[in-house]
Amino acid sequence: MTSKSSPLIFERSREGRYAYSLPISDIKTNSVESLLDDKFIRKNKAEFPEVAELDLVRHYTELSNKNFGVDNGFYPLGSCTMKYNPKINEKVARIPGFSESHPLQDEDQVQGSLEIIYSLQEELKEITGMDEVTLQPAAGAHGEWTALMIFKAYHENNGEGHRDEVIVPDSAHGTNPASASFAGFKSVTVKSNERGEVDIDDLKRVVNENTAAIMLTNPNTLGIFEKNIMEIREIVHNAGGLLYYDGANLNAIMDKVRPGDMGFDAVHLNLHKTFTGPHGGGGPGSGPVGVVKELASYLPKPMVIKDGDTFKYDNDIKNSIGRVKPFYGNFGIYLRAYTYIRTMGATGLKEVSEVAVLNANYIKARLSEHFEIPYKQYCKHEFVLSGVRQKEFGVRTLDMAKRLLDFGVHPPTIYFPLNVEEGMMIEPTETESKETLDYFIDTLISIAEEAKNDPDKVLEAPHTTVIDRLDEATAARKPILKFENLKQEK
């Protein structure tokens, strides 16, 4: 591995340098020893970096120039909906009345903020076909877990606490079985059929008296719509189970069909994906959960409700599973999502889904002669191709993903879902132009040609990035996670 990376801020440090100085305080201060117990006081000086202001500014400016995001390049990361985040969202989120409010302020001082929360709940109820919505969960997996805890409380309250199995398709997001386990359930896998949809016969085999729920994404992770969803609903409901909708792929069906109309009992959404609250870099996210009326009394508290002309928190929720997030979730993301929904309107959201589906099918059609396409039918917002043809020349999907970096394109999701050999999952979203799509397609085709005629160029990629191919085995076995470890290595 060759590195052209910047030195760490600690490596720039020189003793005695500082970025700025403060005036000498004329306020009498107490010693640390007089304020804290001895066990809380450091025995050694903290090793903070010491740099001049100019060095500090240059360091972080240099790092920022090396970042890659939707604002500076195509980001077709399958199942992540890396769409453009409109800048009007940021303007609204920075309105002082919102950005400077505090979650512990009295209700009468934050009526505008509470109205935003209430109004967003109402919008999401309409979009999903659910009867009630909580905005508390902080991310998609958090929303999954919240919904499953609601299911668990519901079954226990109905004397069916023995229901401890959650059915998960073999193409599901990895968070689905993880959330099920975290909520105290066992995961049971249902197979996909030759069309990439849930195998109905296998579903009938795994459903039993212990079934608590099935977790589905529709369209699924292969980008295929589960056309038998009503039959799936009937099978699971007849067995006493509930249907959970993973909202990761809602971008494909807005104003076309609603999860509630498909028979789902609960749904989580990703405001940081579908509704343009920016994501990547660790957050913050937002994973609201909607439920049918039979489950409404189990939602986390408090809920924000409208009482006449005012808005307030409602803690009187009979069977509530309790709080799942301090205060009331990530409010800044609510502002961005609400702005997006109000800007687009129902017609705009419908067009979003139509163009997202069109873009995915356009790419799929143009690449079909150059790559193996395991599922031939029209896809929705994303699709999965396979690199098995290129594997014949010793080039794997990982190598092609690395080569894409040389062309200024973020690689798609690779080796997921697990039921496609050498899989590459591509989601272009609706915000990309035809010119961008064509550039990406032509680039992938050229890489496929390189795999056949000049495989070493692909195998040794990337060639133009700050860091060349990583030694992933050593990185996994001997991770250097802090500066102390780096000093030891050197």
From Swiss-Prot:
Keyword Oxidoreductase: yes
Entries under Gene3D superfamilies matching the protein: 6.20.440.10, Aspartate Aminotransferase, domain 1, Type I PLP-dependent aspartate aminotransferase-like (Major domain)
Cofactor list: pyridoxal 5'-phosphate
GO terms of molecular function: glycine binding; glycine dehydrogenase (decarboxylating) activity; pyridoxal phosphate binding
Superkingdom assignment: Bacteria
Reaction catalysis annotation: N(6)-[(R)-lipoyl]-L-lysyl-[glycine-cleavage complex H protein] + glycine + H(+) = N(6)-[(R)-S(8)-aminomethyldihydrolipoyl]-L-lysyl-[glycine-cleavage complex H protein] + CO2
PTM sites of type N6-(pyridoxal phosphate)lysine: 273
Entry's EC annotation: 1.4.4.2
GO biological process, one term: glycine decarboxylation via glycine cleavage system
GO CC terms, sorted: cytosol; glycine cleavage complex
Family: Belongs to the GcvP family. C-terminal subunit subfamily.
HAMAP family found in the cross-reference section: GcvPB
PANTHER family found in the cross-reference section: GLYCINE DEHYDROGENASE (DECARBOXYLATING), MITOCHONDRIAL, GLYCINE DEHYDROGENASE, DECARBOXYLATING
Subunit composition and interactions: The glycine cleavage system is composed of four proteins: P, T, L and H. In this organism, the P 'protein' is a heterodimer of two subunits.
Protein name, as recorded: Probable glycine dehydrogenase (decarboxylating) subunit 2
Lineage of producing organism: Bacteria, Bacillati, Bacillota, Bacilli, Bacillales
